[in-house]
A protein has these predicted regions:
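Non-catalytic interaction-recognition regions
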Residues: 4-448
Length: 448
């Protein structure tokens, strides 16, 4: 069992890194949709791989729990409350949060909150509903993440961290990083390869999103990790330079920050665009897809291509029970191995203690492939290429199926030697799937 758990892993050493990994960090203004899932699954598996290789990792979710989007959430719930609870005629603004989940929150608020609240002036109502709805959404997000097998070490509140803004802005001023123009406060980010300088404080004295992010990154960098990894959506590409500029002004080494960008996901079903969720408006919810194909299939397909490339797949492929469905084909390989072990007269201990001698070319090739997992894991971590593990598992499963179909394994004089090779294949497939956050099956049936 110890061999099984540790095969391919490394113990912490002087070369081990201390990594701060921030990912998902979706605004708590709605349920998680499929666009969030890719970065979520990637970040979770990257953390598993890093820990497997002996590194220390902290996984954090940055909760954007202040600002205009949170107020807009409260306003949207208040308008839904007036329309669906008070039965008033309501005029909605051009921009607001829509979907059945907003109506659900409004109706729940009627039961959860004091009736007297709704007699207050509108700004107080919106403020209370903003916090109430945000808390509900964060609970739902955590539930969505749990259904994907993802758990964070910490959730950082933007509202709490931003209380330190004055000290951070004072340091930026001392570093000559700020100036005033057009009644706004600007960051001289163009000095550090940004396209232009950026506004931190607007004319109305409110802070921009960047200001909050600068305070957050200062809080992170004070913890002195070896490396900081952020996983953002590809639409945040232009944001990298301005954050790195702020780090330099604050006296940090911005090279310690690596930003990985997650490209878009396009889901199909029967070669048609996947149906949007009525509950969330114009989004495909993670929960809907998990209910459709399962957590493991979803994780595998999201990790099967580089994070920075577009991903398109038909969910019906993940329901097929043939070689066109990679995750089924890998499960099937492991199931075949375990079925042979059950039929074998030898114990696992006997098999593992059998010396491997006089192997032919095909047997050596399969054994070599099974033993290649450690270098695949290292390469996937160093290159942030987690798809390498998916490709490895698919290839190893295919090689095993070819080996299995080519001749007998149990009814031969070399049965123990061949079973040992098969055990090594199973071990590598199991650990590969473990790092992908997938539990490999030891038995499958047609119903699976």
């Amino acid at each position: 069992m110890e061999l099984k758990e540790k095969f391919g892993s490394k113990l912490p050493s002087e070369n081990s890194q201390k990594i701060f990994l921030e990912f998902v960090s979706a605004n708590p203004t709605g349920p998680l949709h499929i666009g969030h899932a890719r970065g979520a699954v990637f970040g979770d598996s990257l953390a598993k791989i890093a820990r497997f290789l002996g590194h220390e990792v902290l996984c954090e979710y940055y909760v954007n729990d202040m600002g205009s989007q949170i107020r807009l959430l409260g306003l949207s719930v208040w308008l839904a409350y007036r329309e669906h609870v008070l039965k008033e005629s309501v005029t909605y603004p051009e921009v607001f949060y829509k979907g059945e989940y907003i109506i659900e929150i409004a109706k729940k608020a009627r039961n959860d909150l004091e009736p007297s609240l709704f007699q207050e002036n509108e700004e107080i109502i919106i403020e209370v509903l903003s916090g109430y709805a945000k808390d509900l959404m964060l609970l739902e997000i955590k539930d969505n993440l749990d259904s994907l097998g993802i758990h964070f070490d910490s959730y950082a509140s933007e509202r709490e961290i931003f209380k330190c803004k004055d000290a951070v802005f004072e340091r930026l001023e001392k570093a000559n990083a700020l100036y005033e123009k057009d009644s706004k406060i600007w960051l001289k980010s163009s000095l550090y390869q940004d396209e232009s300088d950026r506004v931190l404080i607007k004319e109305d004295k409110t802070y921009t999103y960047l200001a909050g992010d600068i305070v957050y990154h200062d809080e992170k960098f004070q913890q002195n990790y070896t490396k900081y990894i952020n996983i953002w959506g590809a639409d945040h590409h232009g944001y990298i330079a301005r954050v790195k500029a702020s780090l330099e002004f604050l006296g940090y080494d911005s090279n310690k920050l690596e930003v990985l960008l997650a490209q878009m996901v396009r889901l199909l079903k029967d070669n048609e665009p996947y149906k949007m969720s009525k509950r969330a408006g114009n989004f495909i919810l993670i929960k809907d897809v998990i209910d459709d194909v399962g957590k493991d299939a979803l994780r595998f397909i999201f990790l099967s291509k580089r994070l920075d490339t577009h991903l398109e797949f038909d969910v019906n492929t993940l329901k097929k029970q043939d070689s066109s469905n990679p995750i089924y084909y890998i499960h099937y390989a492991n199931s075949r191995i375990h079925t042979m072990l059950e039929k074998s007269p030898f114990s696992k201990e006997e098999i593992l203690q059998t010396p491997l001698k006089n192997l032919n070319a095909e047997e050596k090739y399969l054994l070599f492939s099974a033993l290649s997992l450690p270098k695949i894991i290292e390469a996937s971590f160093e290159e942030y290429g987690l798809q390498k593990i998916c490709e490895y598992a698919k290839t190893l499963a295919s090689e095993f199926h070819h080996f299995y179909n080519a001749g007998k394994i149990l009814d031969t004089p070399k049965a123990k030697e061949l079973l040992k090779i098969c055990l090594m294949v199973s071990l590598s497939l199991t650990n590969a799937f473990k790092l992908l956050g997938i539990e490999i099956k030891t038995r499958i049936s047609v119903k699976d």
